[in-house]
Curated annotation (Swiss-Prot):
A motif (GXWXGXG) lies at residues 20-26. This is Peroxynitrite isomerase. Keywords: Heme, Iron, Isomerase, Metal-binding. The lineage of its organism: Bacteria, Bacillati, Actinomycetota, Actinomycetes, Micrococcales. InterPro entries: Calycin (IPR012674), Nb(III)_bact/plant (IPR022939), Nitrobindin (IPR045165), THAP4-like_heme-bd (IPR014878). One of its GO terms (molecular function) is heme binding. It comes from Clavibacter michiganensis subsp. michiganensis (strain NCPPB 382). PANTHER family: PEROXYNITRITE ISOMERASE THAP4 (PTHR15854:SF4), THAP4 PROTEIN (PTHR15854). Its EC number is 5.99.-.-.
Amino acid sequence: MIEIPTGLPAELVPLSWLLGVWEGTGVVEYAVGDDVVRREFGQRISFSHDGLPHLNYSSYAWVEGDDGPVPFVTETGYWRLRRRVTDGDPGPAMLPPTGERPFTTADEVETLRNADGGFDVEVALVHPGGVSELYVGQVKSARIDLATDAVLRTEGAKAYTGATRLYGLVERDLLWAWDIAALGQPLRTHASGRVSHVD
């Protein structure tokens, strides 16, 4: 059973099953040139909110070294229902809202439900290696399907052109899979993991 925290903005209810801290393991397997890189890793994922209609997201992964855990990769970003921003939303930048805050009740959020019975979502992620991704997709029950709508790379970033991600709640664990198009290759399997709720 998914518990909805008191004070959660109504727009976040479809994503509320993600809230909290998750820890577990995963594996990356991807061809780099003539070699296939295969590595197991530990992972800590956090979804939180600060009263605004988006989830704060961070993921940190490590590999086991001879002297203990060694930092591997990290990413951070924001998850929200996909809708048009209104005068009731802050921004751009630090500009305050000029109207009433939208979608504050369950009935108002229901108007955002799509024809498939889910809710459209967008996810903005930033990687410290010079890559930013904008994903679009949908959340339906306890499953999220995402595909990149845009990828932005700095001049020094590695070749990376697109991705898909799948998240699902299975037996109270969060399972995920991430396919990428990178290093001159088409979209293919890249990494997956299983994390358990720890906080």
